[in-house]
Amino acid sequence: MDETLLDDIIRRLLATNNGRTVKQAQITETEIRQLCLASKEVFLSQPNLLELEAPIKICGDVHGQFPDLLRLFEYGGYPPAANYLFLGDYVDRGKQSIETICLLLAYKVKYKFNFFLLRGNHECASINRVYGFYDECKRRYNVRLWKTFTECFNCLPVSALIDDKILCMHGGLSPDIKSLDDIRRIPRPIDVPDQGILCDLLWADPDREIQGWGENDRGVSYTFGADKVAEFLQTHDLDLICRAHQVVEDGYEFFAKRQLVTIFSAPNYCGEFDNAGALMSVDDSLTCSFQILKASEKKGRFGFNNNVPRPGTPPHKGGKGR
């Protein structure tokens, strides 16, 4: 993709933020198609299980909350000042899924070895057809463009390993993973199936109430207990599981004696929750720290601070689309 055009798309997306309101970006359908095509090539040129190195900043669900994505970059540093890994769920729910996904794809194409995107359960046609992205594409462009995004999403990697010690995914563990090679072997492009390793990586949830594997209230995949986290880490010689997929009150929340962390980066999610959002920084020694996007009653006035861990709040249980 032409470097000058790419830089101009990024400039236009960032220019939507004038300090108080965030306007819609003026990007043509042709430009978005080029962006999808270029990013698809980059995704397929890199493994399905990305092998990354610290230092890196990790973000959870963004869900079309474009002003909050810009705030994440304001506090973490705009690329390439910092390396980033996003854990999926870029679209649906929020008002500006198109700006959100376009900026992330543009950064991916421009900084392919410093900026990484994983697939979330909402990067799937059957889900984002229902929860807002399809309607936004149809209203602002056309259904053809939604299909182009779908083809791009089907090529996203599904997991990342940081310095052989921190395993990241959108959802959670799978009872079918015997070796990390099982993740590497998942073919692409691929739609998200109703069961199996790919489904579980995008849909599974930890559950404090159980041991072993349980039924998931979402109607998809499983829940897993702290014992399964400890067992998985020991088997694969890992230190931490890092995932997203659930709203947590403080933006991040530990599980299983700090062997798993949930990160959620959309504060005041959907305007219905009073949750904070978080950004996790992993330094060279693999020490994790958090920057918090505080919850706020007034949209557009979030504060940030470094937060010490507080007692965890129970994960919200919700329907299939959350």
UniProtKB/Swiss-Prot annotation:
Its EC number is 3.1.3.16. It catalyses: O-phospho-L-seryl-[protein] + H2O = L-seryl-[protein] + phosphate; O-phospho-L-threonyl-[protein] + H2O = L-threonyl-[protein] + phosphate. Binds 2 manganese ions per subunit. The modification N-acetylmethionine is found at M1. The keyword Iron does not apply. Residues 303-322 are annotated as: Disordered. Belongs to the PPP phosphatase family. PP-1 subfamily. This is Serine/threonine-protein phosphatase PP1 isozyme 6. The lineage of its organism: Eukaryota, Viridiplantae, Streptophyta, Embryophyta, Tracheophyta. The gene is TOPP6.
